[in-house]
């Protein structure tokens, strides 16, 4: 699973996710992409589950890019532990995703296959998403 090798600080504030994504909103690598429509923290496990769903569906053809990285440590106290005594230990890593952010990109696969792969990946994610394509390409809409 994805996680940073080294961080400046061990633990992070919870924070809030405001506004729209400033960067990472356009397709840079592939012909098709999966774009986030809601703000949410996406965990490393969810990213990995979505990646597996895509790669299993496209069956080793084409190329996949993961455009988000889980760089935020999420801490949690154990069950039935009294409050106080410091912040809990790190439970998992997450990526803060804003609306408009491209999560995954695909290239070298037909449009309907990419759309189906992304719809399977979207089921593994806690946010609403949509499939986007390069300007003028509507072949991913053929299956609808």
UniProtKB/Swiss-Prot annotation:
GO CC terms of this entry: cytosolic large ribosomal subunit
Gene Ontology biological-process entries: translation
Keyword Ribosomal protein: yes
Keywords: Ribonucleoprotein, Ribosomal protein, RNA-binding, rRNA-binding, tRNA-binding
Entry annotated with the keyword Ribosomal protein: yes
Signal sequence annotation: none
GO molecular function term, any single one: rRNA binding
UniProt xrefs under SUPFAM superfamilies: Ribosomal protein L16p/L10e
Family: Belongs to the universal ribosomal protein uL16 family.
Subunit structure: Part of the 50S ribosomal subunit.
PANTHER family, sorted: 50S/60S RIBOSOMAL PROTEIN L16, LARGE RIBOSOMAL SUBUNIT PROTEIN UL16M
Biological role: Binds 23S rRNA and is also seen to make contacts with the A and possibly P site tRNAs.
Name of the protein described by the UniProt record: Large ribosomal subunit protein uL16
Natural source organism: Novosphingobium aromaticivorans (strain ATCC 700278 / DSM 12444 / CCUG 56034 / CIP 105152 / NBRC 16084 / F199)
């Amino acid at each position: 699973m994805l996680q940073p090798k080294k961080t400046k600080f061990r633990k992070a504030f919870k924070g809030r996710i405001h506004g729209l994504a400033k960067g990472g909103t356009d397709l840079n690598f592939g012909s098709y992409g999966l774009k986030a429509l809601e703000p949410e923290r996406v965990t490393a496990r969810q990213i990995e589950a979505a990646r597996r769903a895509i790669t299993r569906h496209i069956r080793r053809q084409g190329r996949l890019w993961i455009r988000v990285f889980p760089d935020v440590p999420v801490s949690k106290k154990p069950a039935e532990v009294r409050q106080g005594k410091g912040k809990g230990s790190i439970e998992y890593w997450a990526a803060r995703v804003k609306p408009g952010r491209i999560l995954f990109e695909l290239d070298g696969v037909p449009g309907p296959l990419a759309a189906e792969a992304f719809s399977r990946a979207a089921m593994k994610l806690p946010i609403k998403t949509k499939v986007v394509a390069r300007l003028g390409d509507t072949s991913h809409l053929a299956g609808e």
